[in-house]
Amino acid sequence: MFPRTLFAVAALLLASPALAETPSPERFFDGETTGTGTLKVMMSKAKTLTDRGTGRTERDGTVVLDQIVEEPGAPTRKRQWRLRQTAPGKIEGTLSDAKGPVIGEFANNVLHMRYTMKDGVKVEQWLRLSPDGQQAANRMVFKKYGMTVATLEGSVRRKAR
């Protein structure tokens, strides 16, 4: 009886997407995403930023995310992320806006990344994936010379498929 019960439980888990799939950065960024956030720069008015992204996972497991970022009063920016899991829970990659690597961890549905922008601003970012894997809370802290110069609070949503 035990093998039958085990088989039945396994079949139920595989048949139920909510139970079988846990959120992951690879699944979240595969396809189209949209994001919005409030950027607060020291001694400036808050601005609303928006982005649109198209992501895919390459054969080697690298997640490639092409983004278009729009900010009031600034030209539209295109950028590309390339992220790859290097060990369980460890992420490394590149961002076209950054100098040097993007380093991160993924645990408890939170992707935590650190990188340095080309102008020397250090960025720390947390993306907290929802349990259903369809949206993420986005928090970013920007530092220059060790001082926080800006923050961003927002969200990213996957396009329904």
Language model regions located:
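Hydrophobic helical h-region of N-terminal Sec-dependent signal peptides
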Residues: 8-12
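Bacterial N-terminal signal peptides that target proteins for export
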Residues: 1-7
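Low-complexity, intrinsically disordered Gly/Pro/Thr-rich segments
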Residues: 133-144
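Basic/polar N-terminal segments that are highly enriched at the extreme N-terminus
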Residues: 1, 19-20, 160-161
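Short, functionally important structural connectors and interaction interfaces within domains
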Residues: 6, 20-21
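N-terminal signal peptide c-region/cleavage motif recognized by signal peptidases
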Residues: 15-17
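Central antiparallel beta-sheet cores of small beta-barrel/beta-sandwich binding domains
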Residues: 23, 30, 36-118, 122-128, ...
